[in-house]
Amino acid sequence: MWIPVVGLPRRLRLSALAGAGRFCILGSEAATRKHLPARNHCGLSDSSPQLWPEPDFRNPPRKASKASLDFKRYVTDRRLAETLAQIYLGKPSRPPHLLLECNPGPGILTQALLEAGAKVVALESDKTFIPHLESLGKNLDGKLRVIHCDFFKLDPRSGGVIKPPAMSSRGLFKNLGIEAVPWTADIPLKVVGMFPSRGEKRALWKLAYDLYSCTSIYKFGRIEVNMFIGEKEFQKLMADPGNPDLYHVLSVIWQLACEIKVLHMEPWSSFDIYTRKGPLENPKRRELLDQLQQKLYLIQMIPRQNLFTKNLTPMNYNIFFHLLKHCFGRRSATVIDHLRSLTPLDARDILMQIGKQEDEKVVNMHPQDFKTLFETIERSKDCAYKWLYDETLEDR
């Protein structure tokens, strides 16, 4: 039995039409719990979950003026650049991948990569650096291409005309002659750079949505991303039930999606900081001074070939994200409490199938446990509907 999909958000409409996730819609103009057929009353609770909206990546909240807080970090130390070039290129016996370098700035790392034999596409968002970057590629037979583009603004969700440095990944990859390969194929290319200093979490969310939906850069295959990330966000990303205070939704999403490896650690002080006015010689803002005491971690994120299964697909991943957000929204609650709000299926039976007790807490569930939980619900045949949500709460 299939549900009507009128009024569903686009991603959920696709899920319903594809059969990946069956919903019982609860709302003022839809069936309520009391209208459900008796065979579907499987452990229902009195409350229904809010379907969490997709994050808006266009307008990040600001606590102060943009000019006073925005800054970028660049590799300007020659020795560090040579070290990173060796890390990115890997073993000499392997043919080098095409490298997409994000915001290379003054091009110290770019030059080291070229000297090591790499083929580089420099995606630079600041026009000031472009002439110098282009000069590095002279007499190199096309080993360097420089494009005015901000990697973190690829495929903006705002709609309308895309203006540089934002860009369409389809147009970018077509211009570079890069074709899509199957998900099970080898890594087609590498992306290297640094997450935005004031937008690491936001960038991780955008990439997560792109990866699980196989859109943007991930439409072309299992793109390897190598990024420097701040110490605090790194600790959260790698947290597990052993670190419950740091363990959160992105921990689960990324640990399931990718093999994550630390390639290098470097103090903040090893990088030069630039603002819109140029190099920042004497940072005085307390927030920045605190960051300078931390380390930056260079992490490698390679998407897993076995991420997608019959029951977790690019068509229903958004339901999985909703399950995680719902659970970590009340992280101290038991899993069974959340299940009673998320699905009309028998919550006790589901927990029994995945080998968990009724008193299992959210923060005690490992990433693979959440995936197993989701897939168990998806493949269940006990009820006509798999998931519950209240469409009247959707956009609140």
UniProtKB/Swiss-Prot annotation:
SMART domains: rADc. It is found in: Mitochondrion. One of its GO terms (biological process) is transcription initiation at mitochondrial promoter. InterPro entries: KsgA/Erm (IPR001737), rRNA_Ade_methylase_Trfase_N (IPR020598), SAM-dependent_MTases_sf (IPR029063). Gene3D superfamilies: Vaccinia Virus protein VP39. GO terms for cellular component: mitochondrial matrix; mitochondrial nucleoid; mitochondrion. Residues 44-64 are annotated as: Disordered. Residues 330-331 are annotated as: DNA-binding. Changing residue 105 to A: Abolishes methyltransferase activity. Its EC number is 2.1.1.-. S-adenosyl-L-methionine binds at residues 75, 124, 150. It catalyses: adenosine in rRNA + S-adenosyl-L-methionine = N(6)-methyladenosine in rRNA + S-adenosyl-L-homocysteine + H(+). Keywords: Methyltransferase, Mitochondrion, RNA-binding, rRNA processing, S-adenosyl-L-methionine, Transcription, Transcription regulation, Transferase, Transit peptide. Induction: By the nuclear respiratory factors NRF1 and NRF2/GABPB2 and PGC-1 coactivators. Ubiquitously expressed. GO terms for molecular function: mitochondrial transcription factor activity; RNA binding; rRNA (adenine-N6,N6-)-dimethyltransferase activity; rRNA (adenine-N6-)-methyltransferase activity. Changing residue 331 to A: Impairs transcription initiation. Residues 1-19 form a transit peptide. Homodimer. Component of the mitochondrial transcription initiation complex, composed at least of TFB2M, TFAM and POLRMT. In this complex TFAM recruits POLRMT to the promoter whereas TFB2M induces structural changes in POLRMT to enable promoter opening and trapping of the DNA non-template strand. Interacts with mitochondrial RNA polymerase POLRMT. Interacts with TFAM. S-adenosyl-L-methionine-dependent rRNA methyltransferase which may methylate two specific adjacent adenosines in the loop of a conserved hairpin near the 3'-end of 12S mitochondrial rRNA. Component of the mitochondrial transcription initiation complex, composed at least of TFB2M, TFAM and POLRMT that is required for basal transcription of mitochondrial DNA. In this complex, TFAM recruits POLRMT to a specific promoter whereas TFB2M induces structural changes in POLRMT to enable promoter opening and trapping of the DNA non-template strand. Belongs to the class I-like SAM-binding methyltransferase superfamily. rRNA adenine N(6)-methyltransferase family. KsgA subfamily. This is Dimethyladenosine transferase 2, mitochondrial. It comes from Homo sapiens. The gene is TFB2M.
